[in-house]
């Protein structure tokens, strides 16, 4: 029996993606990004403490201040979104461990809800910290 529009496998290029598969991939990527963010944060703190007494480092930071500041702000905003998204998807998985809300419509709704709540929290924090 042949079904015309049925996907064969998730590895086939004609496979139609769902919200849950995309959110699972982005959950893993956000975890990797958070590890990268912590590594860069600790390395930059170490760099500032080790080389803060040298005049050439001070001069370099002073000349590139706006570039460094804009890069840092974008880095912080992406990190906030990644943190909130990873948190909400983790909460969703904790609910799923108790076998609650496992129907298809609730699964899709929880994915969209976690995406939107993450965006709302990032916007609130950006307004709170960057515009005050």
UniProtKB/Swiss-Prot annotation:
Transmembrane domains' residue ranges: 32-49, 59-81, 107-127
GO biological process: mitochondrial electron transport, succinate to ubiquinone; tricarboxylic acid cycle
Gene Ontology molecular function: any one: metal ion binding
Binding site for heme: 86
One protein family per Pfam: Sdh_cyt
SUPFAM superfamilies found in the cross-reference section: Fumarate reductase respiratory complex transmembrane subunits
Cofactor (UniProt): heme
PROSITE patterns listed in its UniProt record: SDH_CYT_1, SDH_CYT_2
Keyword S-adenosyl-L-methionine applies: no
Cofactor note: The heme is bound between the two transmembrane subunits.
Keywords for this protein: Electron transport, Heme, Iron, Membrane, Metal-binding, Mitochondrion, Mitochondrion inner membrane, Transmembrane, Transmembrane helix, Transport, Tricarboxylic acid cycle
Subcellular location: Mitochondrion inner membrane
Pathway(s) the chain acts in: Carbohydrate metabolism; tricarboxylic acid cycle
Biological role stated in the UniProt entry: Membrane-anchoring subunit of succinate dehydrogenase (SDH) that is involved in complex II of the mitochondrial electron transport chain and is responsible for transferring electrons from succinate to ubiquinone (coenzyme Q).
SUBUNIT field: Forms part of complex II containing four subunits: a 70 kDa flavoprotein (FP), a 27 kDa iron-sulfur protein (IP), a cytochrome B and a membrane-anchoring protein.
NCBIfam families referenced in this protein's UniProt entry, alphabetically: succ_dehyd_cytB
PANTHER family named among the record's database cross-references: SUCCINATE DEHYDROGENASE CYTOCHROME B560 SUBUNIT, SUCCINATE DEHYDROGENASE CYTOCHROME B560 SUBUNIT, MITOCHONDRIAL
Family according to the record: Belongs to the cytochrome b560 family.
Record's protein name: Succinate dehydrogenase cytochrome b560 subunit
Species: Cyanidium caldarium
């Amino acid at each position: 029996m042949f079904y015309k529009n049925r996907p064969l496998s998730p590895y086939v290029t004609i496979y139609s993606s769902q919200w849950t598969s995309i959110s699972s991939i982005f959950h893993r990527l956000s975890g990797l990004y958070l590890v990268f963010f912590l590594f860069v944060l600790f390395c930059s703190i170490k760099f500032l403490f080790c080389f803060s007494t040298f005049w050439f480092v001070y001069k370099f930071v002073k000349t590139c201040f706006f570039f460094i500041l804009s890069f840092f702000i974008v880095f912080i905003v992406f990190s906030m979104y990644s943190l909130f998204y990873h948190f909400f998807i983790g909460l969703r998985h904790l609910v799923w461990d108790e076998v609650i809300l496992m129907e298809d419509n609730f699964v899709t709704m929880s994915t969209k809800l976690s995406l939107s709540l993450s965006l709302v929290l990032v916007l609130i924090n950006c307004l709170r910290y960057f515009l005050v």
